[in-house]
Amino acid sequence: MHLPIQKDVPLAPRTIFRIGGVARFFIEAKTREDFLNSILWARQYALPFFILGAGSNVLVSEKGFHGLVVKPAFSKIDFLGNMMTAEAGAMIPKASLLAMKEGLSGFEWASGIPGTIGGSVRGNAGCFGSNTGDLLESLEAYDSISGSIRKFSNRDCGFSYRESIFKKHPELAILSATFSLQSSSPPDIQKRMVSYSAKRVETQAIGAQCAGCVFKNVPWDSMSFLKRQRILNSVPELHPFKNQEHIPVALLLDTLGLKGYSIGRAMISKKHANFFIIK
């Protein structure tokens, strides 16, 4: 078994923020077989492994990673009826575009997310009121402890706001995911994609070196009634959001006057306070 594993590979060029040290070992797994065998290789040598997608939600330590970093580069996307099955390394914008061409709606909101299918499922990525978990029908993942490939239903994935079972169990490596979409006309789907894109350009730091929203919004139900009232009294700008599920972190940071605040080359966007950019 020959695996194209490299040594001492810089990770900074492989992340949006362009920071971080080197990986002791690195492999770009172009096939599912290489992906599985590379994890087996890491376990054989008692090395930790880390799955790196598009690098859009990763901060790499300057100390690097003293194990094996595996980048899934297998990215096949198939359609059967209203179902779309995408491998872990497929980019979300490409999946959204192909779904549009197939006349399948549901992924329009994801057309501007700079991540992979695997990463999107792991973090239950979402925006504009939609989430990856809302569409997922099932997925396949490799259990590196048992050495088996397991199938997960939507319920098995334990989706919640920006969470899934896969964030809590790093031994599970996502291989592919199947999504249930709705039939629609490509022109109508494209209009919605254009509308979402326009909203992004208007409100977000598009084009900057950034990875989207940094912090999760704060759920109201995570605090007591009294604490909630104190916050509303202290920050009157939050009153329009008191009946919503979350407190927008961008509004909190903006209220604190942190838009444009910087340390070194890292800066809080002047356009959207939950976007951190590199100047």
Residues covered by each model-derived region:
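Active-site glycine-rich loop that binds ribose-phosphate moieties when present
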Residues: 122-126, 134-144, 148-165
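Hydrophobic, well-ordered secondary-structure segments
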Residues: 92, 96, 110, 114, ...
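Anion-binding (especially nucleotide phosphate/pyrophosphate-binding) glycine-rich loop
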Residues: 1-128
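Phosphate/pyrophosphate- and phosphate-bearing ligand-binding catalytic cores of soluble enzymes
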Residues: 6-7, 15, 58, 149-279
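A structural signal for short hydrophobic beta-strand segments in well-ordered beta-sheet cores
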Residues: 77-79, 141, 215
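Beta-strand secondary-structure signal
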Residues: 26, 85, 138-140, 174-178
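Short acidic-glycine loop/turn motifs at beta-strand connectors
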Residues: 62, 80-81, 143-148, 183, ...
